[in-house]
């Protein structure tokens, strides 16, 4: 297969491709969340779950306490669109004063600290920001380390590994949802093409981990089936490893 061909290039170069899994928009304990956590447990693939602080429930925390393979990232503040009419959806955009947006993010961090304070979450709640709709005003990024963030994760190629000192950016590259086409599965062909393209780019241009992005609340059967078969197949392929967000976002000094 084309995927095997790409992984052969990695092996020929004596390198190991890194993949990671991010799922967005967690707010409550739902049947879809249960299905997601079951998939994580069955496959053993580490999952980074982006949680919306202003909407996250105690029930969510209770359910995640028993899911040690899941780390918690901060998904904006309230997942509210503040873009002007006709603009692309964005919560962390330039429409509002930076202090207001940064204040919201800091409030969100405190909310997650309270919600995920139990010993079960030690080392699992990460100071990583996932902007809603994967968009953030560039002017806000330099202030993120000042309010406690050590990581940033959006979608697509990154401009640089560390947009500002003390902030590591690791994105997702394979979105399984066809948002423009009504929210179903993009289909196996497109998903695999995105994955192979991102792996090739990581091999030849920017040595980053490649991220697969899921959205448990909107996934149809085709998406669930693809994700399960992908993780089951990939976990046994040589030349590739699944990485936990804890490893990816650890400081370079800590990883050496």
Give the residues covered by each predicted segment.
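A cross-domain feature marking catalytic cores of carbohydrate-active enzymes
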Residues: 23-25, 49-53, 74-76, 130-133, ...
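A conserved mid-domain beta-alpha-beta active-site/ligand-binding segment of alpha/beta enzyme cores
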Residues: 169-217, 222
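Alpha-helical scaffolding within the catalytic cores
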Residues: 3-6, 56-65, 153-167, 189-201
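Acidic-and-aromatic substrate-binding clefts and catalytic sites of carbohydrate-active enzymes
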Residues: 25-31, 50-61, 84, 128-139, ...
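Surface-exposed, active-site-proximal loop segments in enzymatic domains
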Residues: 83-95
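Catalytic domains of cell-wall/extracellular-matrix polysaccharide-remodeling enzymes
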Residues: 96-175, 219-226
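Active-site beta->alpha N-cap acidic-glycine motif
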Residues: 1-71, 114, 121, 125, ...
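C-terminal domain-boundary segment and adjacent tail
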Residues: 11-14, 151-156, 204-256
């Amino acid at each position: 297969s084309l995927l095997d061909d790409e992984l052969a290039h990695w092996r020929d170069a004596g390198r190991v491709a890194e993949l990671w899994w991010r799922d967005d928009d967690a707010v409550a304990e739902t049947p879809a969340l249960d299905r997601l956590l079951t998939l994580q447990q069955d496959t053993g693939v580490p999952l980074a779950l982006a949680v919306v602080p202003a909407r996250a429930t105690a029930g969510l925390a209770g359910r995640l306490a028993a899911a040690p393979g899941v780390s918690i990232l901060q998904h904006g503040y309230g997942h509210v669109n503040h873009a002007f009419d006709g603009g692309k959806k964005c919560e962390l955009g330039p429409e509002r004063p930076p202090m207001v947006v940064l204040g919201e993010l800091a409030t969100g961090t405190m909310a997650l600290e309270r919600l995920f304070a139990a010993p079960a979450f030690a080392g699992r709640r990460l100071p990583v920001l996932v902007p809603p709709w994967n968009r953030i005003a560039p002017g806000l990024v330099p202030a993120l380390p000042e309010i406690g963030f050590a990581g940033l994760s959006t979608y697509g190629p990154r401009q640089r590994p560390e947009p500002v000192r003390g902030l590591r950016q690791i994105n997702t590259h394979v979105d399984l949802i066809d948002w423009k086409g009504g929210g179903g599965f993009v289909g196996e062909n497109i998903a695999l093409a995105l994955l192979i393209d991102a792996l090739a780019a990581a091999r030849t241009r920017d040595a980053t981990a490649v991220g697969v992005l899921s959205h448990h609340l909107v996934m149809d059967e085709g998406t669930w089936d693809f994700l399960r078969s992908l993780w089951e197949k990939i976990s046994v392929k040589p030349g590739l490893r699944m990485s936990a967000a804890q490893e990816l976002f650890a400081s370079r000094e800590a990883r050496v």
